Amino acid sequence: PCCSKLHDNSCCGL
């Protein structure tokens, strides 16, 4: 998932 630190977590709202 994109909310993982191993991926682009920009979709988490960060």
Curated annotation (Swiss-Prot):
Domain remark text: The cysteine framework is V (CC-CC).
The record's account of tissue expression is: Expressed by the venom duct. Is present in all duct parts with a highest content in part 2 (proximal of the venom bulb) and then decreases in concentration toward the end of the duct.
Q: Name one GO molecular function term.
A: toxin activity
Its cellular-component GO annotations read: extracellular region
Other notes on this protein?
The name has been given by ConoServer.
Post-translational changes noted in the entry: Contains 2 disulfide bonds that can be either 'C1-C3, C2-C4' or 'C1-C4, C2-C3', since these disulfide connectivities have been observed for conotoxins with cysteine framework V (for examples, see AC P0DQQ7 and AC P81755).
Give residues where Leucine amide occurs.
14
Q: Which protein is depicted? A: Conotoxin tx5e
Task: State where the protein is found.
Answer: Secreted
For the keyword Transcription, the answer is no
Broad class of the protein's primary localization: secreted
